[in-house]
UniProtKB/Swiss-Prot annotation:
HAMAP family: tRNA_thiouridyl_MnmA (MF_00144). Keywords: ATP-binding, Cytoplasm, Disulfide bond, Nucleotide-binding, RNA-binding, Transferase, tRNA processing, tRNA-binding. The lineage of its organism: Bacteria, Bacillati, Bacillota, Clostridia, Eubacteriales. Transmembrane segments: none annotated. InterPro entries: MnmA-like, MnmA-like_C, MnmA-like_central, MnmA-like_central_sf, Rossmann-like_a/b/a_fold. It catalyses: S-sulfanyl-L-cysteinyl-[protein] + uridine(34) in tRNA + AH2 + ATP = 2-thiouridine(34) in tRNA + L-cysteinyl-[protein] + A + AMP + diphosphate + H(+). Its EC number is 2.8.1.13. This is tRNA-specific 2-thiouridylase MnmA 2. One of its GO terms (biological process) is tRNA wobble position uridine thiolation. The record marks H123, Q333 as: Interaction with tRNA. ATP binds at A9, M10, S11, G12, G13, V14, D15, S16, M35, G122. Belongs to the MnmA/TRMU family. Residues 144-146, 300-301 are annotated as: Interaction with tRNA.
Amino acid sequence: MSKGIVALAMSGGVDSSVSAYILKERGYEVIGIYMDLWRDEREEYCNKSAAEDARRVAEKLDIPFHIINIGKEFKANVIDYFIDEYLSGRTPNPCVACNKTIKFEAFFNAAKEFGADFMATGHYCKIEERNRRKVIVKAEDDKKDQTYMMYNLKQYQLERTIMPCGEYRKEHIREIAENIGLDVYNKKDSQEICFIPDNDHGGFIKRNYKSKVSEGNFVDKAGKIIGKHKGIIYYTIGQRKGLGIALGKPAYVIDINPITNEVVIGDEEDIFHTELIAKDVNFIPFDKLEKSMELEAKVRYSAKPSKATIIPLGNNKVKVVFQNKQRAITKGQSVVLYDKDMLVGGGIIEEIV
């Protein structure tokens, strides 16, 4: 007897491909869906080979396969947001924006149109029930854990979402793929931003918004001009390489001012802080933070969680006070909160205090 119909987001990679197999083995009826997210006039970013890989896997596993176009939503909510943030002197995380608006909203809605009871992805996270609420828990494979990107999910989404890979280590996923004869078993993981295959975000923004990118001044903490920069979109807090200025000592980006078009340069000690304010905060184990809470937090995907006090400020904002100084807290990035293995929530870094 079927456990229900699952619409699986297939990327053509090994994780979503093996997810299809696991779900079938568990008794679900699986529908494979590839999201055609965006292409420019030359179709430079339309990854046809990925779509074909996904189609071949679906045929091998004997599951229905569809391609849906979510390009309009992707451009408005991810690409335009990404560009606007850089032009505003912030450093966005497009994967967080994509999960919030595309994979777990636009795709979630598309899954319902296909008659699915659930949606699934190849993300490395676990969904469990604790205290009568669905929560997100770190994956078995700590190196592949993707909970940092998932803090925006709501209860209604979690109740209908399955992430099979969270229970496996990456090497086991590849082993399963090879054992069942999937050609993608040794396919490399994508490292770049999906709509910027050459990983040159500055070049991408300049091609699309050349008139908004202009040279400006590097200044020191006192406001003294110490050089010329090629445009604020090319810089982020804590950056040392590629500045193109020689000061006789290591120089770091410590602030970006989009109003004056200036990049502020300082010493390494200037990029360490203990406090930040985050906006657009979402919590998963509960709806609202009523009082201060001791948790762990991290300010970038690759960082280790560090002890911090989370203070509610109202208007979906919190203040995060770390016990120890954190390197290069960056506006536009996400601060993500944990209670041991459980994802508590997160928000966008708005201000460094």
